[in-house]
Amino acid sequence: KVTRKGGGSALPWKTELFRGIVRSAVTEASRKGVPVTVKMRVGIDAEHITYLEAGRIAEAEGVAAVALHGRTASQAYSGQADWSAIARLKEAVTSIPVLGNGDIWSAEDALEMVRQTGCDGVVVGRGCLGRPWLFADLAAAFAGSEVRVRPGLREVTATLRRHTEYLVDFYDGDEQRACRDIRKHIAWYLKGFPAGSTVRHQLALVDSLQALDDLIGTMDLDVPWPGDAAEGQRGRAGSPRVVALPENWLR
């Protein structure tokens, strides 16, 4: 829906349009002292790579930082992110921070990305789904600490409950809407925990805070962190695809 209209990863292909948008955003935001950052992918597909030129344009137009996800739009989240592209962007863009993104599932992944690419920091996406404590792990890792957060099921479900409460507030008290929203996060929160298929199915249909509380109450909350079973990829990987673009966009 985004690239079909020339947005997202399609936009940097039109370099002057991209330049104009970045310039306008930086100019207007600077009036209020707001920094502008640009996050992008490697390109549209393997034949239409845009990130190096887009990074240089963004740098020249005064953005505060650039972030790169090491996949093309056509890859979606399939395969592995190409961290070497982040390294090449870091070599090309020298006056502002370059942030890396893609396949950061743990603090150790973040440290390894920085080691391999020389990037100035990382951006986390799918890795924090159902796992907001990942940011505490990242902060500890970059501070040189080996301490990692490993919550048991009691703490995880309490975090899930609090997340749902925040959604209720966000939706102005609409519990049903909030619960519909939280459903997609439940499997990520419970990844690796022995919650049972029946409870998981019922949680996927939850429609109120009370229903959520009742189902959490049926679980053995003394279960500790499940270790490797809770680690690894989160979210859908998807499959490579043809990117929808406006007519004649690549000419």
How would you label these PLM feature ranges?
Residues E16, G20-R23, T27, R31-P35, ...:
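Alpha/beta catalytic cores of nucleotide-metabolism and tRNA/nucleoside-modifying enzymes
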Residues A10-W13, T37-Y51:
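Active-site mouth loops of central-metabolism enzymes
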